[in-house]
């Protein structure tokens, strides 16, 4: 989301996923296998469900859906990671729940910064398209060193998120993560996070390609789509925060 040691910053996507799932399909030669086209189709379906539910909650009266979407999405994500064969059921549910949260969050940002949501969506699509083109043309390759670097950076970022979450219980926060903080350091950190989130897309592409090459079970199309959705949601939210910071300068 050819490689003996696979690393990715996305916890949902790693080589162990394919190793275990390939073992599961041994002796079941008639089982349909994962394809790139199938994964693209599943990703498109997931994005449709996400956008549809986000559109529904893009309203000032729907902010109560944020905790429902965030907590529900987290629970379903954990289930999906440990029960990959359930992906055809859990991933659509995950997309809907995340959409409920994203719609309300997007409305809050757009109410403060008019047009910011359209800009964030446009940038997310542009980054996805350009990186996919660069990956397919061989300009960018997911080498082992690349994966290791992205994995380390992603781990550091999520430790920062975790520290900020824990500090919030004590009335404190990490100011550079605040979207209202328009300092150069805060903007610089946001740019770094957007770059790392974007780099995770390259690893996701590699994961999908590897799964198709190894003949992973058909349900891994949904699981791979799940990993890509996780990265795209993260990237979109970070772009929203970055744009908000630049608007405050």
Report the location of each language-model feature:
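A hydrophobic alpha-helical transmembrane-helix feature that marks the membrane cores
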Residues: 1-249
């Amino acid at each position: 989301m050819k490689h003996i040691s696979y690393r990715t910053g996305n916890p949902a996507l790693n080589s162990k996923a394919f190793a275990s799932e390939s073992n599961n399909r041994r002796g079941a030669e008639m089982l349909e296998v994962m394809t790139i086209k199938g994964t693209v189709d599943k990703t498109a379906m997931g994005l449709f469900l996400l956008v549809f539910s986000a559109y529904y909650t893009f309203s000032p009266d729907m902010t109560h859906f944020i905790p429902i979407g965030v907590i529900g999405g987290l629970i379903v994500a954990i289930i999906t990671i440990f029960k990959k064969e359930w992906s055809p059921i859990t991933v659509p549910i995950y997309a809907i729940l995340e959409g409920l949260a994203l719609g309300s969050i997007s409305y809050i940002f757009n109410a403060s910064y008019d047009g910011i949501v359209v800009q964030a969506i446009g940038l997310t699509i542009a980054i996805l398209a350009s990186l996919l083109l660069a990956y397919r043309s061989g300009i960018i390759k997911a080498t082992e060193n690349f994966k290791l670097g992205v994995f380390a950076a992603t781990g550091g970022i999520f430790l920062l998120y975790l520290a900020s979450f824990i500090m919030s219980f004590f009335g404190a926060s990490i100011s550079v993560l605040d979207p209202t903080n328009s300092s150069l350091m805060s903007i610089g950190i946001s740019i770094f996070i957007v770059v790392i989130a974007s780099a995770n897309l390259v690893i996701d592409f590699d994961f999908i390609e590897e799964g198709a090459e190894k003949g992973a079970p058909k349900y891994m199309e949904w699981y791979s789509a799940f990993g890509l959705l996780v990265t795209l949601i993260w990237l979109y939210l970070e772009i929203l925060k970055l744009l908000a910071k630049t608007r405050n300068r």
